[in-house]
Amino acid sequence: MPEGPEIRRAADSLEAAIKGKPLTNAWFAFPQLKSFESSLIGQKVTQIETRGKALLTHFSHNLTLYSHNQLYGVWRVVDAGEHPQTSRILRVRLQTADKAILLYSASDIEMLTPEQLLTHPFLQRVGPDVLDMRLTAEEVKARLLSPKFRNRQFSGLLLDQAFLAGLGNYLRVEILWEVGLAAQRKASQLSEEQLDALSHALLEIPRLSYNTRGVVDDNKHHGALFRFKVFHREGKACERCGGVIERSTLSSRPFYGCPVCQK
């Protein structure tokens, strides 16, 4: 399943294709969205925002297209007028003079006014996105210590989009290894030093993954690039202490960690 960094990179590719360009065509599969097609002609996409696995496509006339990929939804960028051969069902097409972005297979799609955006049920439930560069470690620390989250085990908390949007299983695993914490620990049990380390890692590791995952550094400065330290590395030596990385199941998802140095 894609996590926040992958979803943000997908949004970047959509923005690169059509942001700031007048729309020449808009098409929606769902009848309740048909009335918006003509009003979008000539409008521009001003921003594509991510909130966890939801995308918010903001238009210049202040409406916002909300879409959630759920399990099967996928966006694609094509040349204007191109209609790819695929078994997927087209839901949305937004086209400019040279490019188009297509949404396939998703079913959770709405057009929202600014007022509706503030009261949308999913957007009200979901926490701040870890790839929102305005979010600070101090704000994350405050969320960790809030009554709602302070006594939750990290195994479940770091998968809960109400805590922080954009985290998923590989990020959960890598963040907890980076700060040397066991999945059963809770924020209420941590020292100030541990809380500070975790608060920073909850932002730094997703952002490092977003910026560098899959990037090859010719100078071999691997410490500056994201790579898996424990995810899918069961049976191998822990890079920090030499212990053997183990795989288990926590919150119904595979978990990887070092039983020696994660306490």
UniProtKB/Swiss-Prot annotation:
Domain of life: Bacteria
EC number: 3.2.2.-, 4.2.99.18
Catalysed reactions listed for this entry: 2'-deoxyribonucleotide-(2'-deoxyribose 5'-phosphate)-2'-deoxyribonucleotide-DNA = a 3'-end 2'-deoxyribonucleotide-(2,3-dehydro-2,3-deoxyribose 5'-phosphate)-DNA + a 5'-end 5'-phospho-2'-deoxyribonucleoside-DNA + H(+)
Alphabetized UniProt keyword annotations: DNA damage, DNA repair, DNA-binding, Glycosidase, Hydrolase, Lyase, Metal-binding, Multifunctional enzyme, Zinc, Zinc-finger
GO MF terms, alphabetically ordered: class I DNA-(apurinic or apyrimidinic site) endonuclease activity; damaged DNA binding; oxidized pyrimidine nucleobase lesion DNA N-glycosylase activity; zinc ion binding
Cofactors named for this entry: Zn(2+)
Zn-finger (FPG-type) residues: 229-263
CDD domains: EcNei-like_N
Any GO BP annotation: base-excision repair
Name by which UniProt lists this protein: Endonuclease 8
Phylogenetic lineage: Bacteria, Pseudomonadati, Pseudomonadota, Gammaproteobacteria, Enterobacterales
